[in-house]
Amino acid sequence: MSQVFDASAFLATCSARPGVYRMFDSETRLLYVGKAKNLKKRLASYFRKTGLAPKTAALVGRIAQVETTITANETEALLLEQNLIKQWRPPYNILLRDDKSYPYVFLSDGQFPRLGIHRGAKKAKGRYFGPYPSAGAIRESLSLLQKAFSVRQCEDSYYANRTRPCLQYQIKRCKGPCVGLVDAEEYAEDVRHSVMFLEGRSQQLGNELNAEMEKAAMALNFEKAAELRDQIALLRRVQDQQYMEGGSGDVDVVAAFVNPGGACVHLISVRGGRVLGSKNFFPQVGIEEEVAEVMAAFLSQYYLGNAERELPGELIVNVVHEDFAAISEALQTLRGRELTISHRVRGTRARWQQLAVTNAEQALNARLANRQHMAARFEALAEVLGLDEVPQRLECYDISHSSGEATVASCVVFGPEGPLKSDYRRFNIEGVTAGDDYAAMHQALTRRYGRIKDGEGKLPDVLLVDGGKGQLNMAREVMQELAFTDLTLLGVAKGVTRKAGFETLYLNDVAHEFTLKGDNPALHLIQQIRDEAHRFAITGHRARRGKARRVSSLEDVAGVGPKRRRDLLKHFGGLQELNRASIDEIAKAPGISKKLAESIYASLHSE
């Protein structure tokens, strides 16, 4: 029990009505938010002398202050609790990390509409289908629709400026509406079929296509009949993959699984009897909670926390919780529609439920196995480097450029659970001699660790540099300049053969040179973080180089300033299309005279 907080005095004045409570530490930091039908009874349970779970006891030991807000009923308490959790994300609450908006398939308005992926507010005019649980699931649907019905998926700006059909037309994924190769009536029929599929009416669509195929065959239009046959075969394959036996309506199947290492919630989205996809969630579990507590927290945050998320008619769950009635009532209050939460289900629905449980268990076990595998690598690295403690943070730096052009330095960060991608950084290197990797490394490290010295960011336990002796010496120089002399440094060189597994390593100075056997877990970790730094640097370099090259060929043309360059690239849909354009086509762009078009064409084709 907390020695600071007087629980007895607090409970003596605490209300027994419904409400929300907030627990703070001695520095007034919010630790935990909860709700209760009976505030006094619920809060008293925290201050029992025995029977507390270890993490609950740890929370209670930090409590210095408790505030309560009385509400009219439990539903109001639930809504307030979710708002506070979303706003403050207290460390001891179960937190749903994934709060991104979910993607929809978007069908634009117009005579020749496009299909695409949409996230966020639905401002554009058109139709929205979904939401889909992941970008992967939505890409599968769009790929199928492109193969089956050839509705365009290009951006409107690209479409509007085509003068010849693109590659999608050549591979029969588009019918070329941009250059008039398909009439509006045929295209509208393809759009209608796509909508039927997206609305879950695949059975009706299949029957309709069958009838059209027979009609085409009777009319001896065998080419059309063959096209319809291929569409039907594709739809049947998808039905076999996506349809659940006995499925109908809109259902989310949600299963939670908990073990001492963490928690996983697996969600399967079924719309119109068709599986749109599934997704794993790994909530941050702050207190040792039962699986039912994890489920209740997930349902509250997932469905109450996002007003734009579309609700199914029913949830099938694998556990029950006393809050389910309040959650249903809150959804009806907030969203204006009922949501049935089912637990005892039979037959096919029971199989759905068990499938979700199995997926949640397997996903959590795989995540924990990977975490344990990574932890073993960190322990091996500590042993190899002679560290007193297992490092908790590794940083690795790499440099990427093309003959000195568009130099980019990367910083990637790993912890015992894997990559910490939110801490990754890239540095655009300026003002150094082209191709001078040492100067580039000096600039990147000075910028990064200068900020750390000023209190921004965390100091790693081990700093790795890709490049061997020279880069390690440069890292030592920067650390000495900034007075980080105790930081462990590790240089990674490719070795004589330049093959993976034969790296030469340098610890702290070039005199301490060593190698590791190819099966050493520490070497595997070094290779993993080195390769990730290399990948991150290359992608940044390519993006920077591509951006520079998009405008460099136009920069020397008199009369083409930054705004006109942007307008030209927008008009043609990119530099590649502008390169393909003739002088006459360039002259048709807004604000471009024939003389200026000739200058632009000459600049683009000067090499």
From Swiss-Prot:
One CC-aspect GO term: excinuclease repair complex
Domain of life: Bacteria
One example GO MF annotation: DNA binding
Broad class of the protein's primary localization: cytoplasm
Protein family per UniProt: Belongs to the UvrC family.
General function of this protein: The UvrABC repair system catalyzes the recognition and processing of DNA lesions. UvrC both incises the 5' and 3' sides of the lesion. The N-terminal half is responsible for the 3' incision and the C-terminal half is responsible for the 5' incision.
Subunit-structure text: Interacts with UvrB in an incision complex.
Protein name per UniProt: UvrABC system protein C
Top-level taxonomy: Bacteria, Pseudomonadati, Pseudomonadota, Gammaproteobacteria, Pseudomonadales
Gene for this chain: uvrC
